[in-house]
Amino acid sequence: MAPNPRKSHPLLKMINNSLIDLPTPSNISAWWNFGSLLALCLMTQILTGLLLAMHYTADTTLAFSSVAHTCRDVQYGWLIRNMHANGASFFFICIYLHIGRGFYYGSYLHKETWNTGVLLLLTLMATAFVGYVLPWGQMSFWGATVITNMFSAIPYIGQTIVEWAWGGFSVDNPTLTRFFALHFLLPFMIAGLTLIHLTFLHESGSNNPLGIVSNCDKIPFHPYYSLKDILGLALLLLPLTTMALFSPNLLGDPENFTPANPLVTPPHIKPEWYFLFAYAILRSIPNKLGGVLALAASVLVLFLSPLLHKSKQRTMAFRPLSQLLFWALVANLLILTWIGSQPVEHPFIIIGQLASTTYFIILLILFPITSALENKMLNF
């Protein structure tokens, strides 16, 4: 009998082992769909971004008008731009849900997969930040100025790093040019990291909602999960296209309809919604260096998740106290997101400080203590 090329060809064999004959736990829920949705988001962003880059000019005098030209004069340019801008929001929705699922079901115990995932999040955040600067609107310019200026808080070398990143003494043409270069490069880095992420995942096999070893009960990825993923893709593309067609500017900042002006500061500088929780943590500390460290810690704390796991059970499915804490953490993050969008005045300052403190207390102190308590309860 002739060998099946799907199982013998070097390249097809790799694809087959990752997407077709991959043994998958039979009980993984829709929460496991977000990995494939993130892959779709990445492909959509790279494709729309490539088309936008063909019409974009990375120059301070032309950037704003080149984006306007894309929307007005390029065939379906408005749609490509709207899909790209809102695609970023959906990318972050998916990654936050993906991380939340990993946290809830103890997927972080696959340490290599988890750590590459956190690196992916950091790279995605960097990509979104440099991309936000490119249209060269008011909030683009001032956002870039404020966030890059944070590095000046680093003792001794801070100011040098900032001027080196800017390519001058303020955010100007060299900054825009290098941000465009970085925004073009980083998505391909994300794609490379994704392959590493998948390699580590397929090394250990996927986790499941029960958190138990599922070697005795696995099914092939295709057709079961390939079909389930296609349903997920349809359910993601529906709200994305609806938003791009009906309310493309819903999540954007009105300030970005004004070209960048270094002489006029917007009344309230704030980043895109998906960075607001971290921005609120940054602002809640009156000291500049302290704020920058808290901002970094708000994301880097994810690296500690495997070390802080003290429970005898992997998932939170049967741990009501940990579930309560988890949802308190989700509510806390929503409060931080809201606070980040508000001006720096009473009562928002104190709410932000309380929410920031609670965020770190829940993650670093309450979760391990609760896990230890639940372990004790198991013995009764």
Swiss-Prot record:
Entry note: cofactor: Binds 2 heme b groups non-covalently.
Protein role: Component of the ubiquinol-cytochrome c reductase complex (complex III or cytochrome b-c1 complex) that is part of the mitochondrial respiratory chain. The b-c1 complex mediates electron transfer from ubiquinol to cytochrome c. Contributes to the generation of a proton gradient across the mitochondrial membrane that is then used for ATP synthesis.
Official protein name in the record: Cytochrome b
Organism lineage: Eukaryota, Metazoa, Chordata, Craniata, Vertebrata
Residue positions binding heme b b566: 98, 197
GO MF annotations in UniProt: metal ion binding; ubiquinol-cytochrome-c reductase activity
Residue sites binding heme b b562 per the record: 84, 183
Cofactor or coenzyme needed: heme b
Membrane topology: Multi-pass membrane protein
GO terms for biological process, alphabetical: mitochondrial electron transport, ubiquinol to cytochrome c
Keywords carried by this UniProt record: Electron transport, Heme, Iron, Membrane, Metal-binding, Mitochondrion, Mitochondrion inner membrane, Respiratory chain, Transmembrane, Transmembrane helix, Transport, Ubiquinone
Compartment annotation: Mitochondrion inner membrane
Cited CDD domains: cytochrome_b_C, Cytochrome_b_N
PROSITE patterns: CYTB_CTER, CYTB_NTER
Self-association and partners: The cytochrome bc1 complex contains 11 subunits: 3 respiratory subunits (MT-CYB, CYC1 and UQCRFS1), 2 core proteins (UQCRC1 and UQCRC2) and 6 low-molecular weight proteins (UQCRH/QCR6, UQCRB/QCR7, UQCRQ/QCR8, UQCR10/QCR9, UQCR11/QCR10 and a cleavage product of UQCRFS1). This cytochrome bc1 complex then forms a dimer.
Family statement drawn from the similarity comment of this UniProt entry: Belongs to the cytochrome b family.
GO CC field: mitochondrial inner membrane; respiratory chain complex III
Residue spans crossing the bilayer: 34-54, 78-99, 114-134, 179-199, 227-247, 289-309, 321-341, 348-368
Gene name tied to this protein: MT-CYB
Domain of life: Eukaryota
Residues the entry annotates as binding a ubiquinone: 202
UniProt keyword annotation of Membrane present: yes
Record has Transmembrane as a keyword: yes
Main location: mitochondrion
Miscellaneous comment as given in the Swiss-Prot or TrEMBL entry: Heme 1 (or BL or b562) is low-potential and absorbs at about 562 nm, and heme 2 (or BH or b566) is high-potential and absorbs at about 566 nm.
